[in-house]
Regions:
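N-terminal targeting segments with Sec-dependent signals, encompassing both cleavable signal peptides
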Residues: 2-513, 520, 524, 529-535, ...
Length: 571
């Protein structure tokens, strides 16, 4: 019996030793396992870090009774994040449904994702490996397989591009005062009765008032004289010219003491021997018998004599024409042309500061566009909104100014007030940018896509959203051809480094935030152009010193981390 018990213990010990030696051997030889990580340096796109790991096991490495669980973990200062799934592998004798690695060797391919955090820039990707054989478990210890995360996609500029509502202020507005002098048939003299007509009296008074009004400037006077088309050209041509002379004489007398009337080209005369256009217009407005027939004659014949003959053949209709239509055509039309001159920009600003209530809404909105001081601009638009509560433009512009001041919540509130007055594409665009700056990408996209017609601004906003989603081709298309930092960033992220560089180089003015200069430095590093990299990195730091610390941990510059010039630049 003692022999049997000793024999059993010996067998059990041998089994345990065999299990342990299998695990220990795998751990000891774990350096023979090869790992390939794609990308070699992790990157964040669309707010996540994706990784592909390919592991290759040599022959006679994987114990056939062992199950191995590999857990990818990203470790960084202050914490760590485990990827969303693990990789389980098993030897060929294990009864389970995991990936089998035989004694002849094998491989696996793993893909996983984690949400990105800023702390992950300087990090290590490790595999934590646990092996199980029967009831025995052995941790192999972490295996480092990659360094850090490149976070260039997070540089996307989410600053808003709200659309200001324009004023419709026009400083100079043309105005014309009209009057007619009518003549007896075949006469060119002005009947004294005509000069007492209401329109003539009003014209005289208008000329006097304008001549002493500094806000109105006399520009010109047009005199157009006509003869009715019921006579011959031989009679009507000199007749219309004589009527022009009498009308011209009359109107010039009214300007006799006004200096501007002495300038060359102030008076313009024109004569029309047969006023067929006027005839047609008067007939169209009338209810005269045979109206349609008369108009048909005009459309069928262009010869004045034929027209006259055909119309005079309509006996009853012609009698009506002689009394109701033709007398209206024997006339001289006078038009005094004036420019109404509004306030200058300087006057608008002065009045806005003194008493804005004396300005109309267009002048108030104009005032807002004349100052570069955002706080003063806000004050002007608030006054415009207070005095014009039904005009959405004032509230909209308040919102735009608040966004420029970094007060996004208040800006959104103003856009909502504007929306309550008039919900249009401008408001949708601006609410979209308000949501984008606040980080509500889904809401921003909803606003932009709800617009009746896309604008360059809304397409820009959709381009920003596309970058945050990792849709770089779409972003490039949305941004269009206008050089911008975000366009260059999208080009770089999609792999078109040369075009990204040319886009940045063609920008007329670089943002004082330093982002364009910093991206240039990143491109310089990518192209291994040390001088280009350093000069632009220094420029970025000159704009904003924070880029020093950022560059220190940016793996875009990994190849230069030991370079003395780089180190001195970011110290």
């Amino acid at each position: 019996m003692k022999k049997f018990r000793s024999y059993f213990i010996l067998i059990l010990a041998a089994a345990v030793m065999t299990g342990c030696s299998g695990l220990n051997k795998m751990k000891k030889n774990s350096n023979l396992v090869k790992y390939e990580v794609t990308p070699k340096v992790l990157e964040t796109h669309a707010g996540v870090v994706n990784v592909t790991i390919k592991g290759t096991f040599p022959a006679k490495y994987f114990d056939k009774k062992t199950t191995v669980t590999a857990t990818p973990v990203l470790t960084y200062t202050g914490g760590e994040t485990t990827f969303d799934k693990v990789q389980v592998l098993q030897g060929e004798s294990v009864q389970a449904n995991n990936k089998v690695i035989t004694t002849t060797g094998g491989d696996f391919t793993y893909t996983g994702t984690i949400p990105y955090k800023d702390a992950m820039k300087m990090s290590e990707l490790v595999l934590r490996i646990k092996a199980v054989r029967g009831k025995k478990t052995l941790d192999f210890g972490p295996v480092k397989i990659a360094d850090g995360v490149i976070a260039t996609s997070t540089l996307v500029d989410k600053d808003g591009k709200p659309i200001m509502s324009k004023d419709n202020y026009v400083r100079i507005n043309p105005e014309s005062k009209l009057a007619d002098i009518h003549y007896q048939i075949n006469q060119a003299d002005i009947n004294s009765k005509e000069l007492k007509a209401e329109d003539i009296a009003l014209l005289k008074e208008y000329i006097k008032s304008v001549s002493v009004d500094s806000s109105r400037k006399l520009k010109s006077t047009d005199v157009s004289s006509y003869a009715s088309p019921d006579g011959s050209m031989k009679i009507n041509t000199p007749l219309s010219e004589k009527r022009g002379k009498t009308a011209d004489k009359f109107i010039k007398k009214e300007f006799d003491k006004i200096p501007v009337a002495k300038t060359e080209g102030f008076f313009n005369e024109k004569t029309t021997a047969e006023d067929w256009d006027g005839f047609k217009s008067e007939v169209e407005k009338s209810s005269i018998q045979d109206k349609d027939l008369i108009l048909r004659v005009l459309s069928m014949y262009s010869d004045p004599e034929v027209r006259n003959k055909e119309i005079k053949n309509m006996t009853s209709a012609f009698e009506k024409l002689k009394t109701d239509i033709l007398p209206q055509l024997r006339r001289s039309k006078m038009a005094v042309n004036v420019d109404i001159v509004g306030r200058s920009d300087e006057q608008i600003l002065a009045q806005m500061k003194a008493d804005p209530t004396k300005l109309n809404v267009e002048e108030m909105l104009r005032a807002g566009s004349l100052t570069k001081d955002n706080n003063e601009q806000l004050k002007f638009y608030q006054a415009a909104a207070e005095n014009n509560p039904k005009d959405f433009r004032a509230q909209n512009n308040i919102g735009c100014t608040l966004m420029a001041l970094g007060k996004t919540d208040e800006a959104i509130a103003s856009f909502e007030k504007a929306k309550a007055i008039e919900n249009n594409d401008v408001i949708k665009n601006n609410l979209g940018f308000g949501s984008l700056v606040k980080g509500d990408v889904a809401k921003a996209e909803e606003y932009f896509n709800s617009m009746t017609a896309a604008t360059p601004e809304s397409k820009y906003g959709l381009g920003v959203i596309a970058i945050t989603k990792g849709e770089y081709d779409k972003a490039v298309n949305d941004f269009g051809t206008e050089p911008s930092f975000n366009l260059a960033l999208a080009l770089y992220l999609k792999g078109d480094v040369a075009k990204a560089k040319s886009t940045l180089d063609s920008m007329k003015e670089l943002c004082k935030c330093g982002k364009p200069s910093y991206l240039k430095a990143v491109i310089g590093a990518k192209l291994d152009d040390k001088n280009y990299m350093l000069s632009n990195l220094r420029e970025a730091i000159g704009f904003k010193a924070d880029w020093k610390a950022y560059a220190k941990t940016d793996l875009e510059f990994a190849k230069f981390f030991t370079d003395d010039t780089f180190k001195s630049t970011v110290q």
